[in-house]
Each structure stands twice: as structure tokens, then as C-alpha cells.
Amino acid sequence: PNFWGGSILIAFKKDSSINERKLINNYTLIKKKIIKNYSRFKVKYKKLNNLILKQKINAGYGAGQMVPSFAYHLKTDLSFMDYIVDDNKKRAGEKYPFLKTEIKFFNEKLLFNKNFLITALDGVIPISKKLNKRNIKFTNPLK
């Protein structure tokens, strides 16, 4: 045959010696589990939102890639934060699309008189250690 473009023709033939296995349909079981987990997720974020208001969170720590998704699920543009502190100097002065909060490079002065929410979910452990070491008030969103 004469082919034009970048196409390739491949033909397969099923081996007749292989027995067919029936797939078990776990859809209803999996669907229930997904719905249950999603409901728990929504409840957890609602509690976190209440905690943010109650504790008067006014800054974030950790300008990770997931911050916009985190903010989306919190149903906020993070305007309640004065800034997000990050250890990466290249991120200083940057902003996330559709979020109000500016990223600032780590400086001891930025930590005082602030109540932080850890915003880099993948960095909760090292950020918690750093803030604990300095006796800075913070909320771990994963607890």
C-alpha cells in the first residue's frame, strides 16, 4: 500500500491459545468510596476554613506549585494573607494567577507578629520544623 503523511499501519491477531478473563466490575464499590472520600475532603476543608478565620491567619509559608489548587479548594483568593514567605529567592515578588497574595523571600522580620498557614503542602514537615524552631505561630493544613 501507498501511505501519505506520518501514518503507519499495524495489524494484530489475537493468540487463540490465551483464555479470556472476565473483568470484575467494581464501579459501584469504587464510586461509593470516591464519594465518601470526597465528602471527607470537603468537610476537612470547611473545618480548615473555619480555623483560618478563628486563628486570624494573616500570612502563608511556602510558595509551592499547588498553592492555587489549595486556594481553590479553600474557596479563597488568599487575600486574607499579607504575603506568602518562600525560601526560593527567584519567587520573590511573584504572584499566582487569580490570587491576591504576593510572594516574599524569607526574612526573619517577615515572621514576627504573623500567624502562618503552611501553603506548600508538600513541604509541611520541613516548614513546620523551621517555624517551631523560631516559636512562630502556624497552622498545619494537613492535621
Name each region found by the language model:
Residues 7-143:
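Hydrophobic, well-ordered beta-alpha structural blocks that scaffold small-molecule cofactor pockets
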Residues 1-4:
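Conserved S-adenosyl-L-methionine
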